[in-house]
Amino acid sequence: MFKVKFADIGEGLTEGTVAEVLVKVGDVVKEGQSLYFVETDKVNSEIPAPVAGKIAVINIKAGQEIKVGDVVMEIEDGSDTSATSEPKAETKSEAKVEVVEENASVVGATPVSNDVIVRKQTTTVNKSSTIKATPLARKVAADLNIDLSLVTPTGPNQRILVADIKNHQASSTQLASQPISQPAPTPSPSAHQTIAPTIKVVEPSAPLSWDEVPMNGVRKATVKAMTKSHTEIAAFTGMKNTDITETHKMRTELKDHAAASGIKLTYLAFIIKAVAKSLRDMPNINVRGDFANNKIQFMHNINIGIAVDTPNGLMVPVIKGADHLSVFEIAIKISELANKAKDGKLTRAEMTEATFTVSNFGSVGLDYATPIINSPESAILGVGTMSQTPLYINGELQKRFIMPLSMTCDHRIIDGADAGRFLIKVQDYLSKPVLLFM
């Protein structure tokens, strides 16, 4: 009998939460086949079987907290029944690791937008992208062409599991096979009639009551990161309206050309390129503080994090070496990383080592905000909603495209004057976007 223990999957974790058990007692499994899905404050991972055999004992269930070293299952593999073998060392490399976040929560839960939202613009939201489901459940639903919004979740935090997909399929098949009886006609309400919604009435004198939901790994990391940022960083925010009319014109001219090559050219791509070039011009913004040793670290790399809202929580994938990429290449990276984040396929390497973050809260209609620094970085740029504004240019009233920018900095190592100069530098690049291609 082989005892399967919950092992450290390579991130120094000590505990996790079982999101879904993928097998049942009596199942015959192959080596490497996924046994269960676990969430931690660092990663999501499907844990594979270290040996082949029949599932004899299952000691876990969805929603259960487990610690490293706990025996989660026992597999009949033909070995000595007294054996207490640990999972094979290869398990760490075989485990399919999917990053949830690393300090991503401190940016704020704003969805990534491939376009900066223009005021009064109407957007369509994909409902399935807002539904909580495990990556495996999403894959099964896609294979079976099942709409996730129609599936009843039974997992922790109202998350859809593979079992829910199968139950939905079974019930749909059963309903389809039943004869359809003609219902008795019911009078339709007149145009002046309204149907009152069902309202749960609570007596005013009733004591305060509430529902409790355990925090998942993403929320635990959010609590830790936001507490760290607000208690340790002396943050200040500077704001500036930026004229991006010329960037708007250039994007309009190049958009179809980029689309012909399969590239979605976005405002965000121009902004990230402008930020990267500005960081190269002003290395005193691209810094971290080693406060224990009273030193300032001037980062050699320019790696830009972008906030992405996903069904599993907020993630901040990183565009590494953004200063060496063209606007078109950055646009490709934005699409690739955003899609991988939403599909739960980001690697830890794609979620770490950011030196500066861009948060596009304009995608939810905000003009200004005070974005929270993603520690250990020292600054973050927030992008507001773009609007068309009449401005006097050389004595002539013109229609201009204005984008509000909000930049939060760690005042311990970045002075307010330098933050202002940086915003002006970004504005200069966006007002003369040809410089971004040089």
From Swiss-Prot:
<dbReference type="InterPro" id="IPR004167">
    <property type="entry name" value="PSBD"/>
</dbReference>
<dbReference type="GO" id="GO:0004742">
    <property type="term" value="F:dihydrolipoyllysine-residue acetyltransferase activity"/>
</dbReference>
<comment type="function">
    <text>The pyruvate dehydrogenase complex catalyzes the overall conversion of pyruvate to acetyl-CoA and CO(2). It contains multiple copies of three enzymatic components: pyruvate dehydrogenase (E1), dihydrolipoamide acetyltransferase (E2) and lipoamide dehydrogenase (E3).</text>
</comment>
<comment type="subunit">
    <text>Forms a 24-polypeptide structural core with octahedral symmetry.</text>
</comment>
<feature type="modified residue" description="N6-lipoyllysine">
    <location>
        <position position="42"/>
    </location>
</feature>
<feature type="region of interest" description="Disordered">
    <location>
        <begin position="172"/>
        <end position="192"/>
    </location>
</feature>
<keyword id="KW-0012">Acyltransferase</keyword>
<dbReference type="InterPro" id="IPR011053">
    <property type="entry name" value="Single_hybrid_motif"/>
</dbReference>
<dbReference type="InterPro" id="IPR000089">
    <property type="entry name" value="Biotin_lipoyl"/>
</dbReference>
<dbReference type="InterPro" id="IPR001078">
    <property type="entry name" value="2-oxoacid_DH_actylTfrase"/>
</dbReference>
<dbReference type="InterPro" id="IPR036625">
    <property type="entry name" value="E3-bd_dom_sf"/>
</dbReference>
<dbReference type="InterPro" id="IPR023213">
    <property type="entry name" value="CAT-like_dom_sf"/>
</dbReference>
<feature type="active site">
    <location>
        <position position="411"/>
    </location>
</feature>
<dbReference type="InterPro" id="IPR050743">
    <property type="entry name" value="2-oxoacid_DH_E2_comp"/>
</dbReference>
<dbReference type="GO" id="GO:0031405">
    <property type="term" value="F:lipoic acid binding"/>
</dbReference>
<dbReference type="Pfam" id="PF00364">
    <property type="entry name" value="Biotin_lipoyl"/>
</dbReference>
<feature type="domain" description="Lipoyl-binding">
    <location>
        <begin position="1"/>
        <end position="76"/>
    </location>
</feature>
<comment type="similarity">
    <text>Belongs to the 2-oxoacid dehydrogenase family.</text>
</comment>
<keyword id="KW-0808">Transferase</keyword>
<dbReference type="InterPro" id="IPR003016">
    <property type="entry name" value="2-oxoA_DH_lipoyl-BS"/>
</dbReference>
<protein>
    <recommendedName>
        <fullName>Dihydrolipoyllysine-residue acetyltransferase component of pyruvate dehydrogenase complex</fullName>
        <ecNumber>2.3.1.12</ecNumber>
    </recommendedName>
</protein>
<dbReference type="GO" id="GO:0005737">
    <property type="term" value="C:cytoplasm"/>
</dbReference>
<dbReference type="Pfam" id="PF02817">
    <property type="entry name" value="E3_binding"/>
</dbReference>
<keyword id="KW-0450">Lipoyl</keyword>
<dbReference type="Pfam" id="PF00198">
    <property type="entry name" value="2-oxoacid_dh"/>
</dbReference>
<feature type="domain" description="Peripheral subunit-binding (PSBD)">
    <location>
        <begin position="132"/>
        <end position="169"/>
    </location>
</feature>
<feature type="compositionally biased region" description="Polar residues">
    <location>
        <begin position="172"/>
        <end position="181"/>
    </location>
</feature>
